[in-house]
Amino acid sequence: RQMCIRDRMPLTEALRNIHFPTNPDSLRRAQYRLKFEELFYVQLNILRYAKDRQRRYRGYIFERVGDVFNTFYSQNLPFQLTGAQKRVLKEIRNDVGSGRQMNRLLQGDVGSGKTLVALMSMLLALDNGFQACMMAPTEILANQHYETIKELLFGMDIRVELLTGSIKGKKREAILTGLLTGDVKILIGTHAVIEDTVNFSSLGLVVIDEQHRFGVAQRARLWTKNIQPPHVLVMTCLLYTSDAADD
């Protein structure tokens, strides 16, 4: 705020000084004024788009924390959650219970707890009668997520399936049928999950890992799997972060 006040210059004066500066300081202030205005309107348009999108897309309401989440928390949780993980989970619960479609970014280093937070978010969907899907950019990463989540859910009666391009024939048909009937509760896969033949009974939450490796159209196709778009949780790994939520 202090920078804005100190370097504030009327638009007409800024336009004049950008072409005919009276001194180096006037040129700097004019450049700052014009750059600030450009960035301000970019941010304003982003905010306007976000508000408009919230009005147009209502989200499913996850009203309850039920037996699935509580059983996992009390019996299967491999370690105590960190303060950051608890805070992020609370924010996610607020989002999915607000009536607006969640579109949240979850960032953290490798091993910081992102996958565990994503799984517990998916369990919230299951508790409220919905399915969940996780999409990863490669078969190797999808397999890693599948094995990790299967291990974390060991002993719980939750059908988790893996769908990649290499899964074909009867096994693939069984997975697709299970998605339609609702027997498959959690689907983990690659780009294969956005194919036209993949349809859900009630998809409530989509988790996307490393979203920068998917195109906008590819990510958006998951939203069309329901009449009403599901909640979206995007996981990304940054080199430096203080906001952590386990790969």
Which residues are covered by each model-predicted region?
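Conserved pre-motif I regulatory segment
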Residues: 64-104
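Upstream accessory/linker segments immediately N-terminal to the RecA-like ATPase cores of bacterial MutS
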Residues: 2-76
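Conserved helix-turn-beta segment of the N-terminal RecA-like "Helicase ATP-binding" lobe
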Residues: 143-167
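Conserved small/polar residues in nucleotide/adenosyl-binding loops
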Residues: 1-7, 240-247
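Conserved motor-coupling elements within RecA-like helicase/translocase cores
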Residues: 169-186
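Conserved helicase motor
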Residues: 162-172, 190-195
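Conserved SF1/SF2 helicase motif Ia
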Residues: 124-145
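Post-DEXD/H (motif II) to motif III coupling segment of the RecA-like Helicase ATP-binding lobe
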Residues: 205, 213-242
